[in-house]
């Protein structure tokens, strides 16, 4: 082959018009250009001679020096790909379009058509079902009733009580190729549902009618998920992978679609027509359109156009590990689908968290690709800036599930003028469109002054659009069906996956291996934990203490073997959490058809086998000979093999539990339940002879039984157990008689039966894991919850009636007294000048007086210790300064914007002023109305709205406000006044319709982002503060929601409060609402501090007065212009230092004078003073915290109800398994069976309680940090509320378990024994729950808490006195027995039940003697044991409260 290529190079030379195509910068050669062209022509000629398959895999690559060489495109390295892209696209904004045009020109030259997709939807309706009103709240009662109701509905016994919730109503339209479509609409208008319907990804639970077609083909004729790409608004990624790896994996799974065939055809036609392409474009297309490449040039191209090159090799990160920023994560979500071959893109809110310039750049690059390569795109955006809005060709406006307008962007304002509405001059069209259909905002745009305004409903708009000329034209087009013969054969995909199954398996294997390397600390930690536990086990079962004389010696050996099984089995438990962590991104990839579920499941299993080998080898090598098991190398390896099988079986089982549970709390409960069943039925806790006939099937299917039998047979049929004990009446060896006494089969073949069964289980569990992944969907989808008011409002809207907003959510008596007021609302720019009746109505109710206060700060500096990474880069300073001498004054009734680019120090300045910083060095002076700031008093008069909206998820909106007002308003305010004030704030912030809505968790359920944001403002406002800080109150909101929040903020300022907002990229509207501006540049220095003026006139005048600064264009956003002209690049170009210019300006001198004036107290004023640190007494704080926790627990059935149900099922299971064993006292084994039931119940119920309480405490702790910083309460009342609420639930749990089990097992019915049983169970559950809380309180996050607590469970289990009785422990370990909480529980339970029984056993000793000799338990000591358990609970409670008070893991 090589020789042939040489021959072609020498023998044929063809001069070509390469200069037309060549980049002129390449002509810098050492030889003449002509010579180089000749040489290149030879290379091309050689390429032309190759067969097509090889020709499209080879290309001519030009190197940096200008030399060109022939390369195999599958072997391009990172540097070569980077250089190629650098030549094609040097500056993304300018060169991407040129590059795409070159690419299109090449395709057009040979007359090839690119595949295009036209998407039509006709009469599409989507309906869901929802519960209404209080029945929709997830209380323990509703949870139970709903389960029963759904079951009876399923059996058609009860009618369905859910109400229909229409999401989309009879929508029709056409999405054309080569055009960009913008989808707009207020929240809950059905945008996401429409995009999902178009992408063929609607949920199976929804009722869908109508049809969606691609090029005239119905969805069942092709694979929609691969022909189009849906980009979700949720950023679900694996945190341990880098940005480049995430994109490369996506590209590898999606393949290149039909591009390979197009490339082959293109190459064939070019060869026939004798056309030589541009070498760079040629090599790019070959590298991008060839299948089966691990690192594709498409990945690099996507990184470049999305501006992700800067973080390409940074890990994505998650809430635990710091990674890329929110904006970069959003772009990664977009890029993940753009690297694929899909020709239609449906993008859902891709701009959240991005600044307007980045959004513009991304949308522009998508637009270039759509226009030039004839793709299809529908993009929904939240707050598109005017310049981004102008990039689109078509607009779809949705409202209340109906299409109000669909057609060219140019005609949209014409339609609304035809309806009587005009967009004001300084208003973005997109913002206008989102507000004009809303009842609250519509009136301000009414233009027909001669006619009185009447609210126009969405249905009226929709009907009017059908009659409008654009609507008629659309109807005519839809009436003519698409001509299927015009559809390109490659446009729609019929193959389910992008590449071959083998390739997908390789891709998943490579990713799993990568994740294992990234998570190596987990495996190292597990090995260290195993080594530590092996060391403890070795020293506990030392050969000097281990004899082989009696069956009791055998029991200790069996205990050691059983513990080895438990340790190896529990070692697989981490698989459960690791599986669940990866599930969200797995479901996303599965639903997008990246890979079949088995390709994901197989590597997850196979790659863990080597780790199992190492872990088990550590355990067996350390313990086998030291403990003194049978000294036979064959038996050593047999134990090793068996434990490897056990570990693999356990890992498979826990992976399966993760895939079935799909949620960490549910999976933990499932996992515990299964583990419990497997262990109880394993033959150690309860011997085979004592298993009831109705449970014997459980014994035969328990994997632990096979493991227990095999490992026991391996040990007890060895030579050292082959002697007949002295005084024995039978001829059986000690080993055989011991096995028989414990109900184990004394047959050597049982080793191989056990090992075979375990291997069978390994395959079964992993197979079921793959099946669960394939068929189950994500757990706990966001549920639609409708309030009665929402239903009424929707129905009224449909009928065109107007319903009073302020009356929604009030009782009928209140409604009668309500002051009727117009729902109109002034636009924000006009509000500054005039106060309307509506505004007066808003002001009237601020019934609580407050003192207007100003805040001044002078020369504020803030520094932190220099990070190690920066020191490594050569920074020598000890401190990194984030704020450098910032000064300013914020006054009552003035709304100040705090602005600057990312990293300028906006939030830092706000945190410093509000006293929220937990570390660092602060200098400078801060005064409140002239008096030095004292943080304790300041917290009482200030509110701080954080950027992340942190609220307790299980309370309603009204309860959140009630709680805040209760704890933050002064004691003098009575309940009635407080309630009136809350109503007032709710009206001001437009929360009345949401009064009974559950807050929920962000992105999961409950309130939308915008509603959550308003709640954050309201929670601070009900505290009646004089000064309010708000950190980015409009980030992540659409224009309409941002307008509502800003209207709220403006209303707040108009009451005479001092309000400061950091703001990122405000629209003209939002910017106009501010009175003053403090502008920072990167590095924390001020550039402008002063008034904005009407339509930002003062700001514009100041900057336009600086030499070289370009004038602002008409209608351009002053905020965007200001950030552009003060950027680092502009500063460098102008040669100006804006900080210096400001410091030398008249404005600076005026500000300094103002600061000086406000820093002196007014003559009649006095300093702030409060007699107590908190506004409410300690008792009230405790009551309030308890009240909130009560609602939080009552509405958290996944925690409370599941725990009670789990206990109920375990009680029934134990009762039936250990039926009547408590009354049998003939043999030692009878007692051990009854004691085993106590041991296993204590261990599992306790661990279950401790595990499930951890996530609850972790979520509440973040809320606690916010509420404590706001001065609502101290740490002790919080700890009181958190612990007190557990007591009744634990009591219920104890009663359910205690009564059922005590009766069924048949313990002795005396009042004292029954009371002691309940007492010990109650305090055991209590200390376990407190232990779970304590571990969260002393660790930074829930994951570390889980790891630490699980390590202790293993040790507690070993030293509890059941596996090894205290009498058989070496002296040096007995101290641990005394500090192990479970040992005292077992002491109390066993001694209280059996410690005074005089019945004789078959060994001729009484039960009391056996208990004392074997366990060293005395009945007289029960009272002291009770006190010790109370003491343990108090100790854990104290550590929890102390840690919550002392440790603050929130770093600011």
Curated annotation (Swiss-Prot):
Keywords carried by this UniProt record: ATP-binding, Cell membrane, Membrane, Nucleotide-binding, Repeat, Transmembrane, Transmembrane helix, Transport
Any one GO molecular-function label of the UniProt entry: ATP binding
Region span, Disordered: 808-830
SMART domains according to UniProt: AAA (SM00382)
Biased composition (Basic and acidic residues): 812-821
Membrane-related topology note: Multi-pass membrane protein
Cited CDD domains: ABCG_PDR_domain1 (cd03233), ABCG_PDR_domain2 (cd03232)
Protein family per UniProt: Belongs to the ABC transporter superfamily. ABCG family. PDR (TC 3.A.1.205) subfamily.
The name this protein goes by in its record: Pleiotropic drug resistance protein 1
UniProt organism field: Petunia hybrida
């Amino acid at each position: 082959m090589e020789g042939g290529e040489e021959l072609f190079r020498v023998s044929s030379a063809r001069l070509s018009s390469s200069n037309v195509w060549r980049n002129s910068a390449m002509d810098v050669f050492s030889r003449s250009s002509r010579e180089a062209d000749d040489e290149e022509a030879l290379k091309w000629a050689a390429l032309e001679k190759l067969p097509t398959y090889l020709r499209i895999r080879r290309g001519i690559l030009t190197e940096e020096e200008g030399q060109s060489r022939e390369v195999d495109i599958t072997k391009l390295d990172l540097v070569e790909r980077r250089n190629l892209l650098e030549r094609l696209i040097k500056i993304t904004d300018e060169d991407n379009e040129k590059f795409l045009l070159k690419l299109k020109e090449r395709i057009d030259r040979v007359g090839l058509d690119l595949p295009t997709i036209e998407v039509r939807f006709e009469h599409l309706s989507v309906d869901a079902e929802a519960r209404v009103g209080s029945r929709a709240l997830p209380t323990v009662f509703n949870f139970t009733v709903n389960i029963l109701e759904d079951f009876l509905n399923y059996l058609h016994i009860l009618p369905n009580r859910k109400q229909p919730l229409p999401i989309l109503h009879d929508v029709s339209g056409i999405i054309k190729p080569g055009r960009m479509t913008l989808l707009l609409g207020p929240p809950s208008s059905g945008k996401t549902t429409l995009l999902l319907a178009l992408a063929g990804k609607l949920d199976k639970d929804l009722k869908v009618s109508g049809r969606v077609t691609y090029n005239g083909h119905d969805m069942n004729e092709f694979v929609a998920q691969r022909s189009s790409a849906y980009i979700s608004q949720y950023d679900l990624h694996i945190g341990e992978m880098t940005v480049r790896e995430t994109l490369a994996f996506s590209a590898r799974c999606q393949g290149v679609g039909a591009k390979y065939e197009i490339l082959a055809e293109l190459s064939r036609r070019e060869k026939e027509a004798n056309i030589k392409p541009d070498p760079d474009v040629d090599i790019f297309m070959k590298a991008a359109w060839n299948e089966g490449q691990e690192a594709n040039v498409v990945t690099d191209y996507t990184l470049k156009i999305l501006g992700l090159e800067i973080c390409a090799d940074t890990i994505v990160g998650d809430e635990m590990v710091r990674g890329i920023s929110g904006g970069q994560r959003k772009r990664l979500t977009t890029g993940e689908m753009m690297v694929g071959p899909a020709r239609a893109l449906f993008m859902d809110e891709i701009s959240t968290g991005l600044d307007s310039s980045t959004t513009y750049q991304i949308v522009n690059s998508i637009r270039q690709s759509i226009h030039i390569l004839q793709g299809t795109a529908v993009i929904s955006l939240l707050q598109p800036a005017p310049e981004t809005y102008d990039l689109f060709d078509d607009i779809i406006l949705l409202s209340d599930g109906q299409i109000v307008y669909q057609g060219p962007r140019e005609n949209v304002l014409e339609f609304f003028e035809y309806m009587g509405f005009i967009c004001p001059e300084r208003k973005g069209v997109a913002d206008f469109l989102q507000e004009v259909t809303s009842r609250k905002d519509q009136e301000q745009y009414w233009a027909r002054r001669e006619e009185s305004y009447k609210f126009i409903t969405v249905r009226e708009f929709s009907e009017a659009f059908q009659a409008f000329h654009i609507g008629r034209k659309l109807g005519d087009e839809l009436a003519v069906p698409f001509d299927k013969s015009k559809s390109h054969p490659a446009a729609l995909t019929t193959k389910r996956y992008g590449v071959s199954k083998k390739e997908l398996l390789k891709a998943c294997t490579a990713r799993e291996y990568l994740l294992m390397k990234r998570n190596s600390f987990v495996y190292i930690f597990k090995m260290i934990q195993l080594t530590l536990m092996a060391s403890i086990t070795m020293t506990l079962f030392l050969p000097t203490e281990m004899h082989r004389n009696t069956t009791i010696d055998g029991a200790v050996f069996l205990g050691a073997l059983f513990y080895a099984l438990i340790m190896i089995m529990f070692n697989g438990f981490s698989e459960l959490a690791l599986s669940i962590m990866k599930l969200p991104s797995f479901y996303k990839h599965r639903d997008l058809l990246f890979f079949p579920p088995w390709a994901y499941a197989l590597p997850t299993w196979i790659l863990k086998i080597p780790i199992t080998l190492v872990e088990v080898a550590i355990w067996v090598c350390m313990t086998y000979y030291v403990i003194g098991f049978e000294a036979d190398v064959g038996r050593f390896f047999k134990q090793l093999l068996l434990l490897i099988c056990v570990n693999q079986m356990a890992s498979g089982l826990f992976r399966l539990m993760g895939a079935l549970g799909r949620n960490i709390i549910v999976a933990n409960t499932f996992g515990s339940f299964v583990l419990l069943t497997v262990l109880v039925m394993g033959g150690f806790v309860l011997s085979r002879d004592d298993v009831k006939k109705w449970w014997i099937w459980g014994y035969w299917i328990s994997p632990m039984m096979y493991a227990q039998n095999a490992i026991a047979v391996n040990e007890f049929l060895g030579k050292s157990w082959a002697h007949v004990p002295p005084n024995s009446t039978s001829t059986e060896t000690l080993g055989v008689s011991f096995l028989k006494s414990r109900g184990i089969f004394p047959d050597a073949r049982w080793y191989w039966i056990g090992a075979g069964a375990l291997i069978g289980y390994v395959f079964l569990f992993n197979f079921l894991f793959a099946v669960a992944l394939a068929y189950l969907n994500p757990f706990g989808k966001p549920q639609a919850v409708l309030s009665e008011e929402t239903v009424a409002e929707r129905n009224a809207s449909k009928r065109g009636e107007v319903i009073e907003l302020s009356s929604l959510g009030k009782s009928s008596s209140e409604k009668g007294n309500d002051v009727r007021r117009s729902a109109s609302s002034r636009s924000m720019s006009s509000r500054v000048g005039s106060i309307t009746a509506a505004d007066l109505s808003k002001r009237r109710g601020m019934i609580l007086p407050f003192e207007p206060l100003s805040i001044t700060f002078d020369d504020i500096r803030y520094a932190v210790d220099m990070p190690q990474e920066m020191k490594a880069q050569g920074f020598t300073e000890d401190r990194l300064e984030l704020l450098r001498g910032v000064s300013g004054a914020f006054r009552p009734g003035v709304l100040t914007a705090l602005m600057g680019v990312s990293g300028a120090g906006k939030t830092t300045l706000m945190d410093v002023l509000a006293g929220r910083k937990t570390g660092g060095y602060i200098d400078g002076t801060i005064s409140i109305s002239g008096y030095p700031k004292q943080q304790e008093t300041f917290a009482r008069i200030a509110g701080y709205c954080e950027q992340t909206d942190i609220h307790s998820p299980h309370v309603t909106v009204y309860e959140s406000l009630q709680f805040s007002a209760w704890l933050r308003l002064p004691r003098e305010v009575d309940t009635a006044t407080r309630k009136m004030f809350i109503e007032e704030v709710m009206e001001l912030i437009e929360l009345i319709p949401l009064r009974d809505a559950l807050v929920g968790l962000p992105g999961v359920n409950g309130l939308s982002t915008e509603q959550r944001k308003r709640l954050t403002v309201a929670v601070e406002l009900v505290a009646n503060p004089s000064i309010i800080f708000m950190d980015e109150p409009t980030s992540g909101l659409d224009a309409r929601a941002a307008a509502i929040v800003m209207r709220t903020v403006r209303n707040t300022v108009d009451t005479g409060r001092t309000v400061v907002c950091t703001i990122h990229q405000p629209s003209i509207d939002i910017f106009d609402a501010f009175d003053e501006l403090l502008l920072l540049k990167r590095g924390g220095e001020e550039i402008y501090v002063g008034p904005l003026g009407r339509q930002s006139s003062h700001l514009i005048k100041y900057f336009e007065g600086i030499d070289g600064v370009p004038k602002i264009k008409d209608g351009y956003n002053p905020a965007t212009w200001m950030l552009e002209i003060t950027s680092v690049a502009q500063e460098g170009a102008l040669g100006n230092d804006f900080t210096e210019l400001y410091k030398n300006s008249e404005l600076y001198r005026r500000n300094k004078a103002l600061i000086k004036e406000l820093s002196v107290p007014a003559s009649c004023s006095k300093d702030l003073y409060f007699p107590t640190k908190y506004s409410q007494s300690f008792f009230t704080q405790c009551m309030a915290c308890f009240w909130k926790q009560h609602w939080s627990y009552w509405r958290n059935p996944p925690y409370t109800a599941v725990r009670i149900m789990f206990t109920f099922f375990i009680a029934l299971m134990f009762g039936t398994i250990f039926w009547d064993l408590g009354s049998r006292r003939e043999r030692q084994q009878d007692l051990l069976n009854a004691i085993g039931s106590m041991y296993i119940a204590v261990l599992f119920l306790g661990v279950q309680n401790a595990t499930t309480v951890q996530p609850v405490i972790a979520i509440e702790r973040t809320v606690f940090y916010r509420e404590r910083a706001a001065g609502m309460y101290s740490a002790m009342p919080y700890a009181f509320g958190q612990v007190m609420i557990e007591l009744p639930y634990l009591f219920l749990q104890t009663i359910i378990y205690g009564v059922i089990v005590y009766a069924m097992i048949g313990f002795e019915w005396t009042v004292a024994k029954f009371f002691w049983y309940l007492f010990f169970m109650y305090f055991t559950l209590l200390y376990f729950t407190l232990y779970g809380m304590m571990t969260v309180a002393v660790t930074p996050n829930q994951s570390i808490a889980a790891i630490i607590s699980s390590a202790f469970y293993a040790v507690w289990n070993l030293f509890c006195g059941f596996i090894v009785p205290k009498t058989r422990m070496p002296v040096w370990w007995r101290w641990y027995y005394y500090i192990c909480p479970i040992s005292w529980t077992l002491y109390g339970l066993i001694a209280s039940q059996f410690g005074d029984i005089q019945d004789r056993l078959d060994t001729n000793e009484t039960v009391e003697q056996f208990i004392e000799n074997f366990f060293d338990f005395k009945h007289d000591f029960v009272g002291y044991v009770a006190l010790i358990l109370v003491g343990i609970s108090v100790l854990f409670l104290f550590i929890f409260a102390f840690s919550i008070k002392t440790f603050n893991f929130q770093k600011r």
